[in-house]
Amino acid sequence: VLLDFWASWCAPCRMVVPIVEEIADERRDIKVGKINVDEEPELANKFNIMSIPTLVVMKNGKIVQQVSGARPKKAILEML
C-alpha cells in the first residue's frame, strides 16, 4: 500500500500527484491511497504527518517506509 498525504495548496504535492497516479495505473499490484490532510486531519495525525507531501509504504498493516518531500518516480518505485 502506498499512501500519499497531500493538500491542494501545497505546490510540491501537486508535483507528486501525477507520479503517484501513474504508479497506480502501472502497478496494479499496489494499492494507492491519496489523503488530503485538510479533509482528514485525524488520519494525518494518526500517521504523525508533520509535513507534506509525505509518502507512506505499508506492508501487512505496518509502516515500512515513510518519507517527506517530493520524490521522482524512480525513488518512489524503489520504496515499493
Q: Across the structure, where does each feature detected by a protein language model lie?
A:
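A short glycine-leucine-enriched loop at secondary-structure breakpoints
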Residues: N45-M50
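Conserved helix-turn-beta segment immediately C-terminal to the redox Cys motif
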Residues: M15-I35, E39-P41
